[in-house]
A protein has these predicted regions:
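Signature aromatic-anchored transmembrane alpha helix within multi-pass, membrane-resident enzymes
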Residues: 252-273
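Transmembrane alpha-helix segments characteristic
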Residues: 202-221
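Hydrophobic alpha-helical membrane-interfacial segments at the cytosolic entry of transmembrane helices
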Residues: 66-90
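Aromatic- and kink-enriched transmembrane "portal" helix at the membrane-lumen/periplasm boundary
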Residues: 1-18
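Membrane-interface alpha helices of multi-pass inner-membrane proteins
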Residues: 33-64, 75-79, 263-265
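Hydrophobic transmembrane alpha-helices of multi-pass, membrane-embedded glycosylation machinery
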Residues: 22-24, 53-65, 234-238
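Specific aromatic-rich, kink-prone transmembrane helix
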Residues: 15-34, 239-243
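Lumenal/periplasmic acceptor-binding loop at the mouth of the active site in multi-pass
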Residues: 109-194, 211
């Protein structure tokens, strides 16, 4: 659902997903020239450095050549520093990434796991897990908030952190509840198929392993950083969708599997478009 919303804006979050998908496709080619991989890595680095780390995970797991990976990382970093230096020369007000002061504001988005209350840590883990595995695919009922978050205009969220340090998380109702239940069954089956095949031929499923590790990386990262998971969802949803598709690759020619997936996708479209109806109904009285 966040992709439908963010895709209508010129936002770096959507380009973030594009950069990762491009890199993912490049490393699947038989020939992996650095002349192609470095620009893709630089593109992802320019959007967010954490996504560059994802490219390193994908590269290392699928192509475990230390020397090649070292050249890739070094080339991207040298080019990134050079381009950032040029930008700083042309626009002195910019904050290049190699200056420690440029990260001072990031402290505002940090979540300290060691200082937070246990209920806050557990609530954040629950909200993040739901955002990654459920909300990024099947839209829940949005929370329409006003005084709860100090909004004078309806604020739509899928979770919020209240004054008592408790995460209030949106849920599913009616058709959406059945749809997300079906999605979780399909996702659990995809995970089972992955582990089953990985035990037999781990090298053949290196890409699925890399995708799973990038999702784990994102979970670890955002347990410690970020205040709105929806904004970062493109950074892990691409991995979730590719992991899901690869797991069911052996069923791709089965008519019954194609029919089931088509029915699920139609249901997903209906459910996720309902999110926009809920949002429009919430703001309509303010334009009456």
């Amino acid at each position: 659902n966040s992709h439908l919303i963010l895709s209508v804006f010129l936002e770096s979050y959507m380009f973030s997903a594009v950069a990762l998908i491009v890199f993912l496709l490049l490393i699947q080619q038989e020939e992996k020239p650095l002349a192609h991989l470095v620009p893709a890595g630089l593109f992802s680095f320019g959007i967010t450095m954490t996504n560059f780390i994802q490219t390193c995970i994908l590269f290392f797991i699928t192509t475990p050549r230390i020397k090649t990976i070292f050249k890739y990382v070094l080339s991207v970093l040298i080019l990134a520093v050079f381009l950032a230096f040029i930008q700083d020369s042309l626009y002195p007000s910019s904050d290049p990434f190699y200056r420690p002061l440029s990260y001072s504001q990031e402290q505002d988005y940090r979540f300290n796991l060691f200082e937070a209350q246990p209920q806050s840590v557990g609530g954040r883990a629950n909200a993040l897990a739901r955002s990654m595995l459920m909300f990024s695919v099947v839209a829940p009922q949005p929370l329409i908030l006003l005084e709860e978050t100090g909004c004078s205009f309806p604020c739509s969220m899928v979770y919020y952190f209240d004054k008592d340090g408790v995460y209030r998380i949106s849920s599913y109702e009616g058709f959406g509840k059945g749809l997300v239940f079906g999605w979780l069954i399909l996702l659990a089956t995809a995970g089972w198929l992955f582990f089953k095949n990985f035990r037999v031929a781990p090298k053949a499923f290196a890409l699925s392993t890399a995708l799973a590790l990038t999702m784990l990386f994102n979970f670890t990262l955002h347990m410690n950083y970020g205040d709105d998971f929806m904004l970062y969802s493109p950074d892990w949803t691409y991995a979730l969708v590719f992991f899901f598709g690869i797991s069911y690759e052996s069923f791709s020619e089965k008519k019954w599997a194609q029919s089931m997936l088509l029915i699920f996708l139609l249901g997903l479209m209906i459910n996720n478009l309902n999110l926009f109806r809920e949002l429009l109904n919430a703001v309509l009285p303010f334009y009456g």
